Amino acid sequence: MTSRMQPKSGVYSVSKADFTKIFEDVPKVPITSAVDLRNKFDAVRIILSNSSEDWNKRQTQLKTVRSLVIHGEKVVDRPTMIAHLVQLLGCFELAVKDLRSQVLREAAITCSFIVSKYGIETHSIGEDILVPAMSQVAVSTKIMATSASTLTEFIVEYVQTRQVFTILSSFSTSKDKSQRRQLAALLEIVISKWSDRIKKQIMRQICELIKSAINDADSETRAAGRRAFAKLDEMHSEEADALYLELDHSKQKMLRGGDAASSWASVNSEKGSIPIRSKLSAGSKAHMNISAKFLAQRSASAIDPKATKFAGPSRLVRPTSTKTMARQDTSPAGCKYSNFISMFFKTLLLSAKIPYPNRPGSRTRTSSITSTDSRDTSPTRRNSPLPPETQKARVKYGNGSFFAKLGMPDTTDDDEFLLPIRIRSPLKTPTIEAHDKVSQVLKECCSSSVSEKKEGIKKLLPIVADTSLNPIEIKNIGNCLNRLLSDASNTMVLEIYSIFVRTHSSRLSEWLRLALAKLFARKAAETLPNTKKQIGHTLNVILECFNAHHQLVTVCELMCDPIHLMVPKARVVLLEYLTSLLDEYTEPGASINAKELKTAIRKMLTWASDPRLSILLTPHVEKAICSMFCVNVADFSALISDLDSEQKNWIHQTLQRNGLENGISSNNIATNSGATASRETSNTSFQKESTSFGLPEFGARKGGTGVNLGSLNISNNLALSRLEEQSTSRLMEKVNLNSTVTLPPDTLEKIQNVQDLLQKMRSSENADEQESAISSIYMMICDGGFGVWEQCYAKLLLNLFEILSKSRSENNKKMCLRILGKMCTAQAAKLFDSTEMAVCKVLDAAVNTNDATTALAVEDCLRTLATHLPLSNIINIAKVILNQEPIDDERASLVLKMVTRLFEELPAEELNNIVDDITPTIIKAYQSTSSTVRKTVVYCLVAMVNRVGEQRMTPHFTKLPKAMTNLIQVYVNRAISTSLPRL
């Protein structure tokens, strides 16, 4: 009988090699024509989309997919085959999420086969299944975890997109150590396999993820992080050097140990004299010929292999006492003292043969060589034959105090052994001691000990005020202060920062850019008002002390830097700083016509046109543009001369809207005095202007189009009907408007192609033709080739709404839901007016289906709509649906899940304003007779407590039954306990 117990060696684990062997191990499926292939794919989709189907059938169908791909290439072309596979996207996602290990394994093999065969062309499949695959890595069943991890390796290797890297980055803070470990392993693939063009854009994020892995609490994750660092060092040595310097000393030592030599041959080889890149502490540049063996803190002979050529067979004899031991200087700098060494050369050679039994204090020693170790081949050590005066002189330059004068850390005997003998003039001692003091204080400031760091910061305060610091010391202090910004809660750090800037601003031009980047990021991440105010004071000091034009150019360069990718809140801080610089510290009429400013204006317009960030950034972008205009109208006109007409039109409208009535006129350029007056008008207008312009849709209509839900009767379905009518009327206005636009011929051709596809979408009689049109539009949107949003957006949206409401094809509904999500992500601002209608149509698609994959697509689409569209509109439609009498259980459950996602993903600052508005409605929904709705209400309330705090929600909980309050508290405590980091 075969035992059911499996050995611990991992019989059920799989690897990439196992997957590759099974790729084509599938039964042959005969395919006669393209229609036959499509019918077979439809049959596969029907079985895989049903999660309650027998798992053996689903496993067989996944093998059939591979067989269809292998044997269908002779029947259809490559794009058609990819279109068939994209239609199975929901099925693949459902299979990867399956709890049955056989189904998951087969799904992982099939998806790996697809992405390895078609690569970037199937990026939509790889991007969508990467998240569930990473989730399965955390499963305790080994076959499931290894199958999922192997699938992620295939996806990361063959689908090289920014979206894949963004998904991976989201798992860096996972509570599961298996996911963090897998992320570190995938980083090694990213570094070795991805193209340099993509890696250049994300190199800073890659380094941060490697740093996080090296500092992880899990030992295996740290080991994987070190392997990723080794690969980074191999492929991109400069970035590896910079990352190395950011690590703690203990982590540097771990990385350093891997680079060390481990044999006598490596120490004495010519390669041993090659300079090791800057992985040494300060002062290491004077010893660039040291072998890497000493960096691993191991002892070895000090005899230079080149010096032995001159010494011949005789070797220097060193004393046995460590207090009187002298070192031979083998560095180039030590050649100055060759005369000093030659004074004792003959005496040292004789001492190897002549004992001194009668010398006071001398001792004889016999040595026996019983080992072949390299250390035993060193010369026999005897007592020094030199006079006592000479011994004292040698002790002066050989003991530990010598290292303090060099500014080197006296950590081990090996470090002491590496240093040459240098006789310094007594006149230079004060300078050496001052340099040693600065180095020692900086070392304390970067210490991992909290108390030592605090003492170092206190000592640093008088040092930064010293005007006699040399350029190297100023550079080291500046770098140290930038690192200390992570502990900006210590107000003394910011005070030292301000003093340092005031004292040495004329010598910190190159340092300014990095300092501003650190300060912007720190202020954006800070939540304490007092600390944020202190950081603002430090920024004001920089504004006062540096040249205004130099600051302007530096800020614009930082804004466009592809390496320092700032988070949205940091961009807000940068724009506020830029506005203050232009308004308060730049003289009216000053020249601003520079290429850096022209690039910065383009970058600001890009930020403002991003639908995810427009609400946050657009008001600040408008302020910065108006401030530039007020400084020098003529230069500003020249800066925007290369922009397209739509961007110029938007800038002109922005200037008029903010009090600059004349805008930019080619016939009437304002004078400097007029610019000053305009600036005052602009500042006054900004205080009155609402900060929610939303979208820089260049040339788009800005009228108020909000839907007033307060007057709607929510006792029946009339509310939803009225919402749809208002949204539809606005859409029809856009359709009529777009039909009158004059366009160039190439754009007209694109529009005609899209119009033909839209017409096919409307023909519900031919389901196959409709499905083909939907697939074509979806592929165009995924590949970024749609390109005619302005003219076809409204018509496409109406077609999607009609299919979601009336179509009987579940596959068409799922494709339309994915298209709607892509449209919302790419052009969210165009969907603002139709928010309520979009949510209603998506809910209709969910209510009229029994397909599990359609339900998943509905939840994903609602999540996208909720996080990209106006928050007030989302809350209003949620209230309408939850307040219906009687409550629609299925719609209410989906809406509650949507609100839960809102509170899980959006920042607390945005959500605080809607808590009082939505909470009573959610609590009322708990009265539903459906257990599913009640459970969803509890999850939603728990998410609200976790995001805005228990104190904020307490007034609403007083109206709840005690049992429900206790239940919520249990879930909150459970969420808190699971969010704690694992040790």
Swiss-Prot record:
GO biological process, one term: astral microtubule organization
Keyword set includes Acyltransferase: no
InterPro entries: ARM-like, ARM-type_fold, CLASP_N_dom, TOG
Region annotated Disordered, chain positions: 356-393, 666-690
Residue spans of biased composition, Low complexity class: 359-372
A molecular-function term among this protein's GO annotations: microtubule binding
Domain of life: Eukaryota
GO cellular component: basal cortex; cytoplasmic microtubule; kinetochore; microtubule organizing center; mitotic spindle; spindle microtubule
HEAT repeats: 918-956
Subcellular location per the Swiss-Prot or TrEMBL entry: Cytoplasm, Cytoskeleton
Keywords annotated in UniProt: Cytoplasm, Cytoskeleton, Microtubule
SMART domains according to UniProt: TOG (SM01349)
Role: Microtubule plus-end tracking protein that promotes the stabilization of dynamic microtubules.
Similarity comment: family membership: Belongs to the CLASP family.
Name assigned to this protein: Protein CLASP-3
Organism: Caenorhabditis elegans
